[in-house]
Amino acid sequence: MTMTDPLGDMLTRIRNGASRRKSSVSTPASKLRARVLDVLQSEGYIRGYSVVDFGNGKSELNIELKYYEGASVIREIGRVSKPGRRVYVSVKSIPQVANGLGITILSTPKGVMADHQAREQNVGGEVLCSVF
């Protein structure tokens, strides 16, 4: 069975794992997923991730979730631009999450980045997800 929204599936696995207080979750690997995880790691929302290669052309990402005083660092994580409804923004209309306390992750011509990096580089793009 094919998956229509692989990034949305990864975000759901992270959300479900955090709500069940799992130390890590796994998801099939892709370049886009790895770039989104790079942003989440640099912003301090996850401890890190590792790539497990099965040798038959398939690989998996093991994501280490982060907790602070017993509570998940990620309170809310959700997909914004979906396969049926893509959301594109200019640099002037990049949304803020929780008045700047959260981040929006964008896919831009300069790569996948957080909202504040996109504003600094003066570039817009597709709004992938929001994290708080």
From Swiss-Prot:
GO cellular component, one term: ribosome
Keyword terms, alphabetized: Ribonucleoprotein, Ribosomal protein, RNA-binding, rRNA-binding
Protein function: One of the primary rRNA binding proteins, it binds directly to 16S rRNA central domain where it helps coordinate assembly of the platform of the 30S subunit.
GO molecular function: rRNA binding; structural constituent of ribosome
Family statement: Belongs to the universal ribosomal protein uS8 family.
Subunit and interaction comment: Part of the 30S ribosomal subunit. Contacts proteins S5 and S12.
Species for this entry: Rhizobium etli (strain ATCC 51251 / DSM 11541 / JCM 21823 / NBRC 15573 / CFN 42)
Name this polypeptide is given: Small ribosomal subunit protein uS8
Single GO biological process annotation from the record: translation
Pfam families, per database record: Ribosomal_S8 (PF00410)
